[in-house]
């Protein structure tokens, strides 16, 4: 999927919502545990209930890998279901990979060729040669950690080195890499006060923004400082939507929560565009 196609989906749906798929067998409704593949059945119901309100789904691979080969098969069934039934939806493998070049090449092949995700999250700590293998894939997107939503982000990401915070150096440096047009960036919603500075460095890039909902980030603040002239945001919400209910009405309640976010987004889009 191209960024232009993603932008068109955002305008059509008046939504830049991304729903995180973080299936936890201890939290999903009990009646699903009796099915052959509870994780897939849970994801499928959430997807069917919210697909018209969201432009993206972000399976967090840890929540699948934790269940071994069965979990990985559930991930494959989930991405296949999205691609076959809702091909206009942008898909993100939230895997946070990043290793030496030949290893990153295999990670990229796994997520872009075998699983056929539109994008994957990566950690840039090992530098250019750990990220560029992902960037080589046409119309695939590498979403690089820039400034994350967790408290530990301040341990390293905002450290001042050579007169500039580390996260700013990461952003500036990544712009010089081959195929950098395929980069997007993770910026946490709980760091809204940093968005203005980030937009000065990467004014045109899409930002994946976790931290809305259960983590307490403000959508209005994120949009005030982070939105560009093509919107340029994918705002993720997971727990507040997918775990809105533990009953048989879980998918219906998930839709209600997703609709609340989408309606707020529609108001913002209508006021700005």
Curated annotation (Swiss-Prot):
BP term (GO), one: 'de novo' pyrimidine nucleobase biosynthetic process
Lineage: superkingdom: Bacteria
Pfam families attached to this UniProt entry: OMPdecase
Keyword S-adenosyl-L-methionine: no
InterPro entries: Aldolase_TIM, OMPdecase_type-2, OMPdeCOase_dom, RibuloseP-bd_barrel
The enzyme's E.C. designation: 4.1.1.23
GO molecular function: orotidine-5'-phosphate decarboxylase activity
Active site per database record: 96 (proton donor)
Classification via CDD domains: OMP_decarboxylase_like
Keywords, in A-Z order: Decarboxylase, Lyase, Pyrimidine biosynthesis
Keyword Transmembrane helix in record: no
Catalytic activity: orotidine 5'-phosphate + H(+) = UMP + CO2
Pathway recorded for this protein: Pyrimidine metabolism; UMP biosynthesis via de novo pathway; UMP from orotate: step 2/2
HAMAP family, per the entry: OMPdecase_type2 (MF_01215)
Family: Belongs to the OMP decarboxylase family. Type 2 subfamily.
Protein known as: Orotidine 5'-phosphate decarboxylase
Species in which this protein is naturally found: Flavobacterium johnsoniae (strain ATCC 17061 / DSM 2064 / JCM 8514 / BCRC 14874 / CCUG 350202 / NBRC 14942 / NCIMB 11054 / UW101) (Cytophaga johnsonae)
Protein encoded by which gene: pyrF
């Amino acid at each position: 999927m191209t960024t232009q196609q993603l932008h068109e989906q955002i305008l059509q749906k008046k939504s830049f919502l991304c729903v995180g798929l973080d299936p936890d067998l201890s939290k999903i409704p009990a009646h699903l545990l009796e099915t052959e593949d509870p994780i897939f059945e849970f994801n499928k119901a959430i997807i069917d209930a919210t697909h018209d309100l969201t432009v993206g789904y972000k399976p967090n691979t840890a929540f699948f890998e934790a269940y071994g080969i069965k979990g990985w098969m559930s991930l494959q069934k989930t991405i296949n279901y999205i691609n076959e039934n809702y091909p206009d939806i942008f898909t993100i493998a939230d895997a946070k990979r990043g290793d030496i070049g030949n290893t990153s090449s295999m990670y990229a092949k796994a997520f872009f060729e075998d699983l056929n995700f539109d994008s994957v999250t990566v950690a840039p700590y090992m530098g250019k040669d750990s990220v560029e293998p992902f960037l080589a894939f046409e119309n695939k997107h590498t979403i690089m950690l820039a400034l994350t939503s967790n408290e530990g982000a301040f341990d390293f990401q905002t450290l001042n080195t050579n007169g500039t915070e580390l996260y700013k150096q990461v952003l500036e440096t990544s712009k010089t890499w081959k195929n950098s047009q395929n980069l997007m960036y993770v910026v946490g919603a709980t760091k809204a006060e940093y968005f203005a500075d980030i937009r000065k460095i990467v004014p045109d890039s899409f930002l994946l923004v976790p931290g809305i909902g259960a983590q307490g980030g403000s959508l209005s603040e994120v949009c005030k400082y982070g939105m560009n002239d093509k919107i340029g945001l994918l705002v993720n919400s997971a727990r507040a939507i997918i775990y809105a209910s533990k009953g048989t009405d879980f998918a219906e309640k998930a839709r209600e929560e997703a609709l609340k976010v989408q309606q707020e987004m529609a108001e913002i889009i209508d006021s700005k565009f």
